From Swiss-Prot:
Gene: pyrR
Broad enzyme group: transferase
One example GO MF annotation: uracil phosphoribosyltransferase activity
Free-text function comment from the UniProt entry: Regulates the transcription of the pyrimidine nucleotide (pyr) operon in response to exogenous pyrimidines. Also displays a weak uracil phosphoribosyltransferase activity which is not physiologically significant.
Assigned EC number: 2.4.2.9
InterPro entries membership: PRibTrfase_dom, PRTase-like, PyrR, PyrR_bifunctional
Protein name: Bifunctional protein PyrR
Reactions that this protein is recorded to catalyse: UMP + diphosphate = 5-phospho-alpha-D-ribose 1-diphosphate + uracil
Species classification: Bacteria, Pseudomonadati, Pseudomonadota, Gammaproteobacteria, Pseudomonadales
Similarity comment text for this entry: Belongs to the purine/pyrimidine phosphoribosyltransferase family. PyrR subfamily.
Organism: Pseudomonas fluorescens
Amino acid sequence: MSLPNPAELISQMAIRLKAHLEHRGISDPRYIGIRTGGVWVAQALLEALGSQSPLGTLDVSFYRDDFSQNGLHPQVRPSALPFEIEGQHLVLIDDVLMSGRTIRAAMNELFDYGRPASVTLVCLLDLDAAELPIRPNVVGATLTLAAHERVKLSGPSPLQLELQDLAL
């Protein structure tokens, strides 16, 4: 399977995100990337949009419902939100949507900071394997993988996708 080019996806996503926000009447959203890949995608997306907006970052490690199974990530970093959440329109950005658990954890953390007016979800890839009813508003590409396959984003410059075979 050949994987799409992240730079091309981000260019397309910027166009779709701009149209989505205009359709909803949102002119000054707050952008938040989920560590680590979502931050890289968010930085590239802001550049593609020509936006000087500050970028918030979330580390959702403590909010995940599966760290008893997977263990705590060895490099937990604090979240950094240089703006208010209460009443704001947020654009939440992640690299790969698989189970939906990272997004659920991010939403839980965001609501600890306040009640946003809206949350628009943007993902570089949707692996069409959600375990929770979570779907992105803007997505670069949707892929269907075998159960033993995963996609990993490396970066930040350049952003590259790699197909990993867990069966090997």
